[in-house]
Amino acid sequence: MKKLGGNLRTTEFLKECLADALIKLLKEKPIEKITIPEIAKLSSVGRTTYFRNFTSKNEMLTFKLVQLWERWAEDQDLRERKNFSLNNALSFFQFNYSIKNLLELIYERNLQNVVYDAFYIVMMPQLGINVLECYKSRFYSYGLFGLLDEWIKRGFYESPEEMTEFVNHIV
């Protein structure tokens, strides 16, 4: 996914700068009132970078969530980061608890769809995987989103360990 005019690392860094600026602005006002020029100015990244890499502000938030997951999974040395299993359920809930403030902001602004979109990107198998794997990934994406959605709405009342116990009882 190399972009013309720059290497992938630089592009990813600039995309993340844009997403970080959007998150800062979301703390002040709803996404509908945030303009691309505002995001570009705050991030010190040109508007063309936005238009070259994103189709919407929501897509920037989804990108940021995926980046945070990839970075966290790398730091935790997770082997199963593109696939959900009972073995990595605790890691999943620990990760989401670690970005609790961001998730609460996303929900406060009624943008929970970006959380599901990030799940889908992370969990959807690559092309060529058999049909059962596709259905399994979709099943876990929706199921986990439902659990996370409820956990966020309940104010992260339960611990990541308790949430993992719920998953073990449900599945």
What does each of the following model-derived ranges do?
Residues 107-145, 161, 169:
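Amphipathic alpha-helical packing segments from all-alpha helical-bundle domains
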Residues 77-120:
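Helical hydrophobic small-molecule/effector-binding pocket
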Residues 7, 82-85, 108, 133-136, ...:
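Residue-level recognition of alpha-helical structural elements
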Residues 62, 108, 153:
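Phosphate-coordinating loops and pocket residues in cytosolic domains that bind phosphorylated ligands
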Residues 150-171:
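C-terminal peripheral helix-coil segments that are non-catalytic and often amphipathic
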Residues 1-11:
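N-terminal intrinsically disordered/low-complexity leader segments
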